[in-house]
């Protein structure tokens, strides 16, 4: 075992993996030009929803166990992180409301709820009147609603800063360099930086941050508006996050069409969004794989070095971070790969 374990990548997966290594008494060095900061990766611009139920999509049966296991791992991670630093993370267990804009959206919500049940999970269908009792800012003419008490959230930027503070307190060294050699490092969590080695594609997502004159909502509100998804996420200090589009073009800046549609749909669900100030519009770039599953597993480099890959978490990097970080540390230190990660082997893309 190396005296110092090298983690390549300082996004949410790299930072949680490094933290879990320090939890096990390991010395760690992290390589990233902008660890936990505004860069070209996905973590800084993520919504931060820990929502295995609301986030699952049709035909994602292999992904769902990962999402559930990681959501279940968050309370332990947050307790252990709080034992090292008192920095805020924005971890919030208030729950999630899913609402439908019209009857077609309500029918889609029922179909999705049936899929949840097929996975032995459920969203509680509630009257719109109850949804508005929970969140008075909701539009009065919504067509349907469901409550998912187990879908939570974290504020990614706060979370990463807390991880950085904890890692520095434990003596982790940060090297602000970009690594381009795929054979460098013990654990590789570089997102799209590994696109030359694995079939990763950039999926862009426009995301907005608003400042509300007063708190708008307490729950995460996910809406379906003409079958388009939109979410309204409350943040500490009256900030609101609205997202997110999903596009596979080459625009690295927010498009007017995407910003317009996000605001229009958010206002349809929570009309008071119209009273907010727009303080940021940006684009996150998610590393997607052909099957939408992460890439997780061992490989041997060209120089014969043992290496662990933890990459390609696509839209679920924040949600999957608790499990990916824990599993990454454990597997690198010699434990078996958790069964949830069995479909995620890098070998499935080997030619």
Task: Identify what each model region corresponds to.
Residues 58, 65-68, 99-108, 146-162, ...:
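Short beta-strand to alpha-helix junction loop
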Residues 144-180, 189:
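Helical element adjacent to the flavin cofactor pocket in flavoenzyme catalytic cores
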